[in-house]
Amino acid sequence: KIVKNEAGAMWLKDPDKIYSIINKVQSVLDIPLTVKMRTGWADPSLAVENALAAEAAGVSALAMHGRTREQMYTGHADLETLHKVAQALTKIPFIANGDIRTVQEAKQRIEEVGADAVMIGRAAMGNPYLFNQINHYFETGEILPDLTFEDKMKIAYEHLKRLINLKGEKI
């Protein structure tokens, strides 16, 4: 529906459209505007130009998924393109997204890609503890061990108890 109406990911084909839409939205907001986009529609050839259009239009930060719209979730995140975008943006933070499943991959996006931050997507569904592991690493330099099954069960049980307290139901 969205693409058929020439919106959403379709704008990845037109940096001027990206600028225009973001500029209009930003002009009526009293809060920071952040944008997430993919590296492109079918190829990443406009990734830097699209990112610079968003920056020029006034976004406060830009997140980019390292795959094109055509790729969806196949293949691997294009780290070279993410690096080019990170280098091109000079006024706003750049947030790398895609294929970040471990502390080491988060570290790579910061150090090698040059991202200011990372965004975790699908990996969090299978490992919601990843956020804590990444935060702990960047605060201390220490990589925490993976949680044991027993630890995960304790956390799940505590979460269940809190839900029951909130909803007033019994186990």
Regions found by a protein language model. Give the residues of each.
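Glycine-rich tight-turn/loop motif centered on a GG-T
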Residues: K1-I18, R67-L79, T140-P145
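Active-site beta->alpha loop and helix N-cap motifs at the rims of alpha/beta catalytic domains
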Residues: K1-L33, R38-L46, E55
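A generic short-segment signal for beta-strand/edge and adjacent turn/coil regions
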Residues: V3, A63-H65, A88
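Short, solvent-exposed helix-helix connector turns and helix-capping sites enriched
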Residues: M10, D14-P15, M64, N127, ...
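Alpha/beta catalytic cores of nucleotide-metabolism and tRNA/nucleoside-modifying enzymes
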Residues: S20-N23, V28-D30, P44-A61, Y73, ...
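A cross-domain feature marking catalytic cores of carbohydrate-active enzymes
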Residues: V35-T39, G66, A96-G98, R122
